[in-house]
Amino acid sequence: MNTLATSLQTYFTTFARTQRDLSANTISSYRDTWRLLLKYLAATLMVPANAIDFDAVTAPNVTRFLDHLEHERGNSARTRNARLTAIRSVLSRAMPDHPEHAATITQVLAIPPKRTIRAVIEFLTPEEVTAVLAAPDPTTWTGRRDYALLAFTVQTGLRVSEVCSLTLNDVHLGTGATIACTGKGRRQRVTPLTRATVTVLATYLDERAARPGTALFCGPTGQPLSRDALEHRLAKHLSTATSNCSSLAVKHVTMHTLRHTAAMNLLAAGVDVSVIALWLGHADTHSTDAYLHADMSIKQAAIDRTRPLDVSPGTYKPNPDILAWLTAL
């Protein structure tokens, strides 16, 4: 076994799990990155994957691999950067043990991440939320479950992975009703529930008690719902909701859109960004600042506060009479 293979085994069996205590999702992502990289190098260098050592993991080869991911596999710049992070993590850990490869590793570590475009956050209006919540069939158990699931997510703003991992023990519907979850970076947080959400969950839990298992939102036989299952159920209800709310047709709505909607509702209610960051489980307010850019009402209010005293509030509207406008010009 060559030094690269040994370093990979040491990283994933000892360093990642024991010393860094990385999450299972992070370990899986890093593992998949190295599987892709080794397969790519084996194909391009025409050598067996087992024969690839540190001398093949050069900056030019890694850069070409990242380009391959983006241009041939169709990965986004964000995914490309995540793959680069995985490569860097393993090489950074290996460099002290293999100083003979320090020059090669240092050049790889110097590869810069690709700049990404942060799109404006998409969220649902109150009318669109109403249409989505009205879509599940209330005459079936799955319809009533889906209604509870969607209403719960819109209010709490939990990530889809957090919703999937919730158990019955995470719910407290007594005085000061809350939901406890473990989010990214295994940061634990407790989110308060509104009276309306408590009522919805209490009704759902009465029916949920007849099914086995501990998952909060489960299938008919008690099995936990997967991320794909949640997205599938939402897509099904969106097709129904769109017929009653045409604005949904031009939006790409996912479970994460419901999270964005919860954040925008808090922002519209005047909640401080730092509090919203805590609510969503963000490590800092940098990620939460994106919601400020998405809310046009905040920008309009800023314009109105800075307008001259003799100018009425609102945005500019051109004079529909073009001849009058030209005369006054």
Report residues per predicted region:
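Conserved catalytic core of the tyrosine transesterase superfamily
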Residues: M1-L329
